[in-house]
Each structure stands twice: as C-alpha cells, then as structure tokens.
Amino acid sequence: MTATSMSVQEVSDQSVARWRDYVALTKPRISFMVLLTVVAAGFLASTVVSVSALRVFNAVIGTLLVAASGSALNQCVERLLDARMSRTSNRPLPSGRLGLTEVVVFGTITLCVGLVYLWLAISPMVAGIGFATWVMYVWIYTPLKTRTWTNTIVGAVAGAMPVLIGWFATGATIHPWIIGLFSLLFLWQFPHFMAIAWLYREEYEAGGMQMLPVVDRRGFWTAIKAVLSAGLLIPATLLPVVALEGWTQIIYGLVVAALGVFYLYGACLFLRDRSDGVARKLLRISLLHLPLMMLVMVLSAWVCS
C-alpha cells in the first residue's frame, strides 16, 4: 500500500514537473506582455470603432498560441547555445528534461492551432500578421543573434507586431493610436534590451551571441543606442495627442513627455556611467515605463471616447 502510494505520488510529481517545463517553454513573462499589448491595442481600437469583446478575446487566444510556438521553437534553435550560459542552461531542453522532438511537436501544434484559430475566428489578414511575426522571430531574429548585433532591430519589430493583431482584429484601420502604440513597443525595447545585454554580456559572448555589448567592449555605442531610442520615443508617443481634445490632450501630452524624459534620463545615466549598477537601474526604469505608458494611452482614449 505504501509502495503504491509512493508510486502514485512520484507519478504526480513527475506530471507536475513536466507541466512546468512545458509552461517554461512558452516564456510566461513574454507571453504575459504579449497578452497586455494585444488587449491594450484592442481597447484603443474600441474607442475608434465598434468592437466585439469576443474578437479581442479570440485575438488574445490565437496570439498566445503563436507566441508559445515561437518561444518553444526559439529554444530548439538555441538549445546548444543556451547550454553554455548559466542563465539559460536550466531551461527544459539544455537540461535534458524535455527532448528535441517533443518540443518541435509542441511548437508545431501550437503554431498551427493558433494560426487556424486566428484565421477562422477573426480573419486571414490577422492570421497572416501572426505568421509573419512568428517567421520574423523564429527564422530571422533567432539565427541573426549569432551573426550580427543588428539582430535586436528585427527582434524589436517582432516584439511590437502583436499590437497589430489586437488592433486589426477589431476591423479598425490606420490611426494615430496604433502608430503611437506600435512605436512605443518598438522603440521601448532598445534601452530595455541594451541594459539586459550589458548585464549579461559575458554570458552572451560565451554563448556565441553577437549582442552589441559583446562587440562594443566599452559600451559607448550600446549606451548611445539606448539614448537615441529613448529620445525618439518621446515624439513618437506624443503623436496620438492629435486624436484627443481639451484637457485630456494637454494632460496626455504632459504625462507622456514626463515619462519619456524619465526613460531618457535613465539612458543618459547609463551613457555617463556604464556600470552594471546603472544598467540595472535603466532596466528597472524600462519595466516601469512601459506599463505606465500603456495605462496612460488606454485611460486617455477611454476619457475621450
């Protein structure tokens, strides 16, 4: 009886561990950010056109499935590189907890289900955006990471594209809100990724990844890239002010400018002092900046709707 109970417990523990490994394949933090951006885009679109909440929900489900596939297959491609870096060596593939074949099957199934779901539940165009995002992330950005430091440009485009799924799923057309939101997601990533890449530059080098701090030993151009991107982010996110009116227009402009200057300040600190401590400060500022910016956009659009 005891042996049987222990066997059942062991099977249960193994099942839970296996489930956690599959969840880890989807990179939950990235998936959560994708969810937020799709919902934010859908809400902003609802202030421009009449939107069914079901369509936004369908966009979230389909996008999460495609994103899960991208994360899993990205780890398939990078499994040998991940094994060289301490921050990634415990992932399911390099640690040997999951096999390559089963992860490829998982990634293929989630991709197909996600694309079919977007096609049938929303439209072929939205499914096409989802597929283009997946291709850009898995088959362009991922291989480029070992070839050129410009990989982050492609990665930033792929990272911003889910907002297009959320927006166009509603039937909305080009509008200052989607231009501003896409610009936010695109430009925000550079200071954020430069801080991360600087902190883990030695591990990236050990893994054979050509991030800018790996080739830019002093970090000058890494910091310049962060400063320029943070600077461009201010006018780009001020664009939606033309869709607002009255006091909302003024308040939006002031708050967005203040948040942008705060982000730029963090990047300038990094330019002046390229230490790990300042890089962490920039990273923390970036993690505060993005959700606050999306919240300001959503609230401003809601007030004027």
Give the ranges of each region predicted by the language model.
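Multi-pass membrane catalytic core of lipid/isoprenoid biosynthesis enzymes
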Residues: 79, 87-127, 217-242
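Intramembrane alpha-helical segments
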Residues: 100-170
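Cytosolic, membrane-interface loops and tails of multi-pass inner-membrane proteins
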Residues: 2-17, 77-98, 191-221
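Transmembrane alpha-helical segments that form the membrane-embedded catalytic/substrate-channel core
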Residues: 65-72, 135-143, 184-201, 234, ...
